[in-house]
A protein has these predicted regions:
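Hydrophobic anchor residue at the start of the ABC signature
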Residues: 45, 73
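ABC-fold ATPase nucleotide-binding domain signature/coupling loops
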Residues: 14-43, 61, 65
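Short coil/turn segments at secondary-structure boundaries
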Residues: 6, 40, 76-77
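Conserved "ABC signature" C-loop
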Residues: 1-27, 52-54, 69
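Catalytic Walker B motif of ABC-type/P-loop ATPase nucleotide-binding domains
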Residues: 56-60
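Conserved catalytic loops of ABC-family nucleotide-binding domains
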Residues: 76-100
Length: 102
C-alpha cells in the first residue's frame, strides 16, 4: 500500500474522499470552506504526518473530530511513530482518558 493511502486511512479520510464527486481530485475551497472542522483537522494532520518530520508540534489536533475518531487517530497516527518527537497540546480533558496509557 502506498504511504499516502496509508496516511489517508489512518487519519480517517478515506470515506471522505470516496464521498467527494472527484475523489482526491475534488476541489477544496480556499480555507477549506466546504469542509467540516473535523475534516480540516484530519487533513492538516495527514499533511503533517506525510512530511515525515523528526519533531511535530500539534495544537489540539483532534478537537473537532468525533470521539471515536479521536481515539482511533490518536492510536494509529500520533502514537505509532516511535522515531519522532510529538509535542501535543489539548484543551479538552476527554483526550487524557486514552492518552494516559501511551
Amino acid at each position: 500500500m502506498c504511504r499516502l493511502l496509508q496516511i489517508i486511512r489512518e487519519c480517517g479520510l478515506l470515506e471522505d474522499l470516496q464521498r467527494l464527486p472527484d475523489g482526491d481530485l475534488s476541489w477544496v475551497e480556499p480555507k477549506g470552506d466546504n469542509l467540516s472542522g473535523g475534516q480540516k483537522q484530519r487533513i492538516s494532520l495527514a499533511r503533517a504526518v506525510f512530511q515525515n518530520a523528526s519533531i511535530y508540534l500539534l495544537d489540539d489536533p483532534l478537537s473537532a473530530v468525533d470521539p471515536s475518531g479521536r481515539q482511533k487517530i490518536f492510536n494509529q497516527v500520533i502514537t505509532s511513530d516511535k522515531e519522532s518527537v510529538v509535542i501535543l497540546m489539548f484543551y479538552c480533558s476527554c483526550i487524557f482518558s486514552f492518552m494516559i496509557y501511551h
